[in-house]
Amino acid sequence: MINDASSAAFERAQALLPGGVNSPVRAFRGVGGVPRFIDHGAGAYLYDIDGNQYIDYVLSWGPLILGHAYPAVVEAICAQAQRGTSFGAPTELESELAELVIAAVPSVEMVRFVSSGTEAAMSAIRLARAYTQREKIIKFEGCYHGHADPFLVQAGSGVATLGLPDSPGVLKSATSNTLTAPFNDLEAVEALFKANAGQVAALVIEPVAGNMGFVLPREGYLAGLRQLCDQYGALLIFDEVMTGFRVAYGGAQAYFNVMPDLTCLGKVVGGGLPAAAYGGRREIMQMVAPAGTMYQAGTLSGNPLAMVAGIVTLREIAKPEVFERLTGVTSTLCQGFWKAAFKNGIPFQAHKAGSMWGFFFAGDEVYDFTSAKRADTAMFGKFFHAMLEQGVYLAPSQFEAAFVSTAHTDELVAQTINAAQAAFASIRS
């Protein structure tokens, strides 16, 4: 596969942008080689500047649940752009999208729109501290909640991809109130609550971990966290930036039937444009300015382009048949990949929930960050490039989730599984 144009573009970019990219994982450091520079996308496909076509399972890291350039979304964005792209004043579109979010996500009674998942998570933590009048938070090793300072402790996503323990420039004072526990370990969480009695404002978790690879919560784990938060007077925050409108229309909280106090949303909620949100119980959200005294603001928060994209997207995926279809696609992919790996004698695990899925080159169960890091990342890199050469675009890191869209047809899924069979055979030795 020719990638001369991408190579030249990457060389140019490295002189202008740190590492040649604007988000670290895009640089292919986790798999080696030259990142593909994209020209355009359509449906389930990406097209790079060399003219290569790829079946895309990254989907802009999750937002594009309808696929690339979905006609109704594009039409809505273009129509709104002609009316104005940003006003810095309220619009009815914000209320319209808020109504859709509140109707979909079981625990959310009020919502505030922001422009990124990082903003949503940092605002939710500030709100939890304001509401409880406590300072400490509990997060989980390998879970990623954006790049705000309090979260860059044992973080996943690009931090894990690059093998960084934490980040320089983050002061000890910024993380001194951040406590960490292993994912899927209730006893460790309870020990933290006991050791910090009356001091923990909130526990924040990705209910399905998508930033240390794809790791599911064990049965009863989320319910156990809910019980511990109630017992020790802390708020439970679900970071559903990735899982919201992905594992189910109502997110992971609907999928597992466990209700948090606050929820962070992003990716799908903006229909492919920069938008995110945090929301929860009315009594808590009423503390947010100007209704209350917990300050948070943003120039482009609730901008009309993102609002119309989100409105169209949520209306489309609210149709009952959508998630039935998406769940079938991820099931077929996981089963097909596992069978192909087993046939070639390669230790392999694949997991899915709704329209999210992921896999590890590992023989033992992957249930937390420590076990995820034992997976064979070198083997993953070989597999990634073998798939890329066959026109299948996966996340360029073992420590990221994969996604499907409504544009992924049965034919494309079969083509992907055939490519995986060839890839496993090629890396077997």
Swiss-Prot record:
Nucleotide-binding among keywords: no
Gene3D superfamilies: Aspartate Aminotransferase, domain 1 (3.90.1150.10), Type I PLP-dependent aspartate aminotransferase-like (Major domain) (3.40.640.10)
Cofactors, names only: pyridoxal 5'-phosphate
Modified residues (N6-(pyridoxal phosphate)lysine): K267
Chief location category: cytoplasm
Alphabetically ordered keywords of this record: Cytoplasm, Isomerase, Porphyrin biosynthesis, Pyridoxal phosphate
Annotated catalysed reactions: (S)-4-amino-5-oxopentanoate = 5-aminolevulinate
Pathway: Porphyrin-containing compound metabolism; protoporphyrin-IX biosynthesis; 5-aminolevulinate from L-glutamyl-tRNA(Glu): step 2/2
Protein's UniProt keywords contain Transmembrane helix: no
Entry GO MF terms: glutamate-1-semialdehyde 2,1-aminomutase activity; pyridoxal phosphate binding; transaminase activity
GO biological process terms held by the UniProt record: protoporphyrinogen IX biosynthetic process
Enzyme Commission number(s): 5.4.3.8
Enzyme type, top EC level: isomerase
Subcellular location: Cytoplasm
CDD domains: OAT_like (cd00610)
Gene Ontology terms: cellular component: cytoplasm
InterPro entries: 4pyrrol_synth_GluAld_NH2Trfase, Aminotrans_3, Aminotrans_3_PPA_site, PyrdxlP-dep_Trfase, PyrdxlP-dep_Trfase_major, PyrdxlP-dep_Trfase_small
A matching Pfam family: Aminotran_3
Family statement: Belongs to the class-III pyridoxal-phosphate-dependent aminotransferase family. HemL subfamily.
Quaternary structure and interacting proteins, as annotated: Homodimer.
Name used for this protein in its record: Glutamate-1-semialdehyde 2,1-aminomutase
Organism: Herpetosiphon aurantiacus (strain ATCC 23779 / DSM 785 / 114-95)
UniProt lineage: Bacteria, Bacillati, Chloroflexota, Chloroflexia, Herpetosiphonales
Gene behind the chain: hemL
